[in-house]
């Protein structure tokens, strides 16, 4: 009789001797449908900052313990301490954090010229990382014919220039040399990672080329942030009669909202819709960012305390190629969602909501082009039943 995977003893820690790291091989984090948690995760009622008291899932424990060990071993470019954090006064609720080291120490972005640029094995890629940087391999346990087969390995790798605690990358089939273009398989694992976590602030995201992805090798970002974000409960309006796609309202960056109540057939529908939308944008050289978080159902009024499903927000934006050093922060997946990692103490102390909004809106598409994209994505969703 097989031992249930939640009872199996697997170590995600490295052996003491670095020479043994490569010999150990990559451990598997095996999970099944029963590990995916839908509606039970909430921010603590009295104070969201008390989130460290919430119970951890098996996934959280594996990721956090392995990540902490790599931090102690000095495998990161800097030692991440508790980040100074402030909620900017105003109606949006921006969460600003001072992260000086990331601004200084992070790897220099690659020379990107196109949203559809091919993978270049000569450039830095995730086949060139040290063995100790890989935490584990995500391994979906099939349960019957209805469960999608996981076709490729998805590695969980530390981001050596972390934004926040537990910042890792999901890297699918690294040996295949996939360019930074979203694919259904890795999006599925990203969504399932959110459902595997009991932490309401575990987020997943994707930057396209031209959307400030710094490495042209397919990867998603995952990290913990112990604060609610504006996108979790922002109101929305449906863009099509069936409610396949919504437009987020009352935020500096209106985004396309896709929603699912949790694991099950609807998750596969959402994955298909999102990837058709990102394919459309990539094919037309339109840069984009994507953010996945627990959040409220679509509708005119919502609350950040309602985390009854999964929100996937997609932003089409102006392409940004090359290194951008101006401004208090660079605008990518977390900034569009309301999390602002600020690069200098001076900018952190002087940053206002109005200045943050101006920086973000400067990266958005002109209204005419934004309207064309909106109409095209609505038409794309309408083809679902044709």
UniProtKB/Swiss-Prot annotation:
**Which UniProt keywords are present, listed alphabetically?**
Cytoplasm, Guanine-nucleotide releasing factor, Hydrolase, Nucleotide-binding, Nucleotidyltransferase, Transferase
Instruction: Determine if Transmembrane helix is one of this entry's keywords.
Output: no
Gene Ontology CC: one annotated term: cytoplasm
Expression tissues: Highly expressed in the nervous and male reproductive systems compared to kidney, liver and heart.
Molecular-function GO term, any one: GDP-D-glucose phosphorylase activity
Q: Identify the EC number(s).
A: 2.7.7.78
Question: At the top level of its lineage, which domain of life is listed?
Answer: Eukaryota
Q: Which reaction does it catalyse?
A: GDP-alpha-D-glucose + phosphate = alpha-D-glucose 1-phosphate + GDP + H(+)
Q: What is its main location?
A: cytoplasm
The record's top EC class is transferase
Q: Provide the protein's localization.
A: Cytoplasm
What remark does the entry add? The orthologs in A.thaliana are GDP-L-galactose phosphorylases catalyzing the first reaction of the Smirnoff-Wheeler pathway, the major route to ascorbate biosynthesis in plants.
Tell me the protein family, please: Belongs to the GDPGP1 family.
Function according to Swiss-Prot or TrEMBL: Specific and highly efficient GDP-D-glucose phosphorylase regulating the levels of GDP-D-glucose in cells.
Give the protein name, as stated in the record: GDP-D-glucose phosphorylase 1
Species for this entry: Mus musculus (Mouse)
């Amino acid at each position: 009789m097989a031992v249930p995977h939640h009872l199996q003893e697997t170590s995600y820690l490295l052996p003491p001797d670095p020479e043994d790291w490569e010999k150990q091989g990559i451990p598997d984090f095996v999970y099944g449908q029963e590990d995916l948690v839908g509606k039970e995760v909430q921010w603590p009622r009295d104070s969201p900052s008390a989130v460290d008291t919430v119970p951890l899932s098996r996934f959280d424990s594996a990721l956090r313990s392995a990540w902490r060990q790599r931090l102690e071993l000095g495998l990161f470019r800097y030692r991440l301490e508790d980040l100074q954090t402030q909620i900017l006064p105003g109606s949006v609720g921006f969460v600003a954090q001072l992260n000086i080291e990331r601004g200084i120490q992070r790897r220099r972005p690659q020379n990107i010229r196109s949203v559809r640029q091919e993978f270049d094995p000569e450039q830095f890629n995730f086949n060139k990382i040290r063995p100790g940087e890989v935490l584990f391999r995500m391994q979906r346990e099939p349960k019957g014919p209805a469960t999608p087969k996981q076709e490729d390995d998805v590695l969980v790798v530390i981001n050596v220039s972390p934004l926040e605690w537990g910042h890792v990358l999901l890297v699918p089939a690294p040996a295949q040399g996939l360019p930074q273009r979203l694919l259904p398989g890795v999006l599925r694992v990203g969504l399932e990672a959110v459902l595997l976590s009991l932490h309401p602030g575990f987020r997943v995201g994707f930057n396209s080329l031209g959307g400030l992805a710094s490495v042209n090798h397919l990867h998603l970002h995952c990290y913990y942030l112990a604060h609610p974000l504006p996108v979790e409960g922002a109101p929305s309006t449906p863009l099509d009669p069936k409610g396949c796609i919504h437009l987020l309202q009352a935020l500096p960056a209106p985004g396309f909202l896709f929603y699912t109540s949790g694991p099950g057939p609807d998750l596969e529908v959402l994955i298909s819709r999102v990837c058709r939308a990102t394919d459309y944008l990539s094919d037309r050289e339109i840069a984009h960012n994507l953010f996945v978080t627990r959040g409220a159902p679509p509708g005119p009024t919502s609350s950040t305390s309602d985390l009854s499903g999964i929100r996937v927000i997609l932003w089409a934006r102006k392409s940004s190629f090359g290194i951008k050093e101006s401004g208090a922060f660079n605008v990518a997946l977390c900034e569009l969602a309301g999390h602002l990692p600020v690069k200098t103490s001076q900018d952190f102390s002087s940053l206002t909501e109005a200045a943050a909004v101006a920086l973000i809106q400067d990266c958005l598409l002109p209204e005419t082009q934004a309207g064309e994209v909106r109409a095209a994505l609505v038409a794309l969703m309408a083809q679902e039943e044709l």
